[in-house]
């Protein structure tokens, strides 16, 4: 087999017939598969052992040679080589075709490559290939030119002959008529009879004329056709062609079918064609030029590669190895077989029949029909259904051809190469494991034993519990008690990976140290549930076991859950205590007035705990406690004379003192009620300022405290805790009157339906808000529902409002708001009508969610594909470019504060330039990491904007550099070289995709074209760079605005400042203007509200503007849903969308006009041309949608496994494309290590040299007196048992 580690590039090309024969181990001549009685393969058939190898290891077909000792011998009786049966997976055969056939991919693909090469329309090509027309393949122009005069004379003579014959025939008939008439007259016949005779004679003469005219016409047509005959002409008229061939067959040759195409290709002059096409491109216009460009691309592909155009026509076809198209026996003695065998059988049958017909010398029409059927059989084998009706099997099911085996989710690429199943894995239901540490998980004993079986067996033998592996296996299967002890030992320090599907981001797989647990469920730490998006309502998780030392090291260092506290999308902690833990900590840290023991003082926490245990102190009572090592909270006013480090009597509650025990010793004392918000600030602070080990310990302590105090708090809900406000009735009644008044105005015709709707919606929204306010006032402070919502443990006020206040307004399935509210709440219960309108929205919500999930998954897949080769390739690209970002702004209240976009725009990046204050003090150096601390310092110093490095301005050729990317949000440190930031970006954008709403937004009113697309569809529209629906125009020039309005239409006219021709933008009457009549607009200014077309932004304002536009617009959608994603992730994707340039004029560069060139290659070519003094190429930057950009990648393997597999492979094979295996996907397909992280080439050949000290320790210097001669024996000369020496352990002979 091929070793994947010995090559760095993979090329695909066109195979010629000789290549196919060279790969083959023999010709398949018969359509038989296996003998139904003996079940052995038939000789020369599709499963023949002579061709493909033996079906049993080391055994030939006839049984003469059995056993491995005959390895490599070819049996002289049956001709089968004695070898392993697995060669049947790799040995190929071939079928020698009796007539050539074309390859359907090259003839039928869009565009038809064969058609482009030969300059034929696909339908004409089809006529030739399927025997409906003849094609002229050769014309002897010289000889024809020489002989033309004599041939002209011949044809003239023949014409004369025909005319002469006609005249003689007519004359003879006329004479006969006269004789007949004379005879009739003599007989005295009536005039009627004479007229009949005359008419009959006239008819006959007309027929003679007609016949001779047809003859002359035919001669004329044949002669004209012959005079103008040239190569590649088609002739669909069989009779005309026959005559041509009969008369002038020596001057030309023509034929039908693939043979005609093959002849054309043999004599095709690529160089001359390329030159002619270049000339057409230079001088041509419009359609001709475009077609010439497309044709040149195909011609060029053959010129620049070793591919021969003849590869598109096949003389023999390969037969793939039989184990890849197996035939298996089912229970009932019937056979199930791969569809390919049926398709191959049809080809062989037709081929054999054609051979027989040719041998018999059958008439041409029969032979041609058989050839056509052979062509169709080969088409069906390669790509069934591409032309005409697909070949069907039993039950009218189309058979799966070779193309279908590659395509789609079930095809070879995605099913077997990118989605392999993994050994050493298991899955089970998860339950919560609150007793675990953050880095642990509970693994069921049986599952652990099965997973670690080989390790346990080896250890059993090492410890002499078992004699050999076989007996160790028996022990494990019988689950002896010693096995469990060994299992405990084996699993220590051996991490396992847990994965929950769907794995939407990198935190969907994490490593844990296993702890053995009883039962069959996996125990999961409650804090990692958020990362896995797991809950315990029956979710299942998979366990994988990293085997090699490297894999274990990676799992421990990179994937251990305690090292994955931060979320890669925004760099903030993901392991947040939630629900029960929050209510517990809220209960612990709240204070109660008048509580038991309030106002007392204690000498230490221990004393306060003692008082609490004795029942003399309430947990929430405000007391004074003396602390010895208190770090005071920020803003604490210290008593006079106190210095830090001394003991201090501090006013707090016992609960808060206990809460602070869970935090690191030097963390400032938290002296306040801790709800969800406060807790998130604390955890964020811990993650930013403390090492991971301490953060994990603190989180575990918070979890313990949270659960413990939640249990002791006894928080419950009864129906009596849901209190409906007493004022609700009067509030509703007052608004009912207002609503009735509006309805009355509408019925009198004073207001329109639209106005009525809007007013009613306003009235009832206000009513709902009033009821909400009354309800909140009505809740007692220590009411449990109030505490749950107030602490952020569960639910929100909107949900409480629906239970205790009123449901309010709801929407119908179209998304319009129904102007009649639901006045009841769930505590009171809904009326039938109310219930009915409420179900609308609920049902739509469920349908939406289902659709969203699939859409979001597909978006993630496209994002991963476009960005998978963005890897950090170098430390610093050395650029000084960057993006200017705002870090502080003045709010409406006049106070300067941090800008809202700091989190996603400036945080976790690298400074591009040095920042100085107004007085010239250096506040931060270029290259510094921008963290929370630095941002706060800069804002305080009065800095408003800073310039930061960005992926968009990175100068790296491949991938991007560490400095431009900045901090890795998942680790909080500068990103490492080798990090696959493209995939992390795709996951960060795709993972929250499911949360984005599907609906297009309606503000009441009827649906209309200018509804703003929002949510997921908007994100897709942006990343696919589509022109948005209801596009808003942007001004192409700077100038003055005039708004021109008529009854029906409205348009904006811009008069440019430079006096050029004015530009008109027609817009709808409904659109909202962003400019007024007479305003001055700048270039690129948006004229009406709505979404602008990114392609226009690129054309008018340039690449930097479109980058900013795309990043801002995508962020807009995510922010509106409350999802935080860092800008850098979106920038990585946008960078990939702008990677290519369309070549406008190739100059002297080695580029084709109109081709999409990679920006780096385009610049390199131009540099080369300019250095040689030539004319460089000109191009314009191209914005490609993510699907198009994925397919335009330089890696054909990656593109083929993404979409349109056959199209990509056709194109790649024709151009002889090489895949340099730089991305991740290509390497996964080939089974190589991915070039990210430690798989980067720079780490491949690392040698670790021991230091001198290490060498000295390893080889101690001996004196003679120190040598101990006791390697075998005890020095006393007494013999020792061989078992005590570790010789041949595990290989003891079993002499029983």
Swiss-Prot record:
Keywords: DNA-directed RNA polymerase, Magnesium, Metal-binding, Nucleotidyltransferase, Transcription, Transferase, Zinc
Textual note on the cofactor: Binds 1 Mg(2+) ion per subunit.
Keyword Cell inner membrane assigned: no
Keyword Glycosyltransferase found: no
Binding site for Zn(2+) 2: 877, 954, 961, 964
Binding site for Mg(2+): 535, 537, 539
Cofactor: Mg(2+); Zn(2+)
Classification via InterPro entries: DNA-dir_RpoC_beta_prime (IPR045867), DNA-dir_RpoC_beta_prime_bact (IPR012754), RNA_pol_asu (IPR000722), RNA_pol_N (IPR006592), RNA_pol_Rpb1_1 (IPR007080), RNA_pol_Rpb1_3 (IPR007066), RNA_pol_Rpb1_3_sf (IPR042102), RNA_pol_Rpb1_4 (IPR007083)
Domain of life: Bacteria
Binding-site residues, Zn(2+) 1: 60, 62, 75, 78
EC nos: 2.7.7.6
Entries under SUPFAM superfamilies matching the protein: beta and beta-prime subunits of DNA dependent RNA-polymerase
Record field: catalytic activity: RNA(n) + a ribonucleoside 5'-triphosphate = RNA(n+1) + diphosphate
A single MF term (Gene Ontology): zinc ion binding
Family: Belongs to the RNA polymerase beta' chain family.
Function of the molecule: DNA-dependent RNA polymerase catalyzes the transcription of DNA into RNA using the four ribonucleoside triphosphates as substrates.
Name used for this protein in its record: DNA-directed RNA polymerase subunit beta'
Gene: rpoC
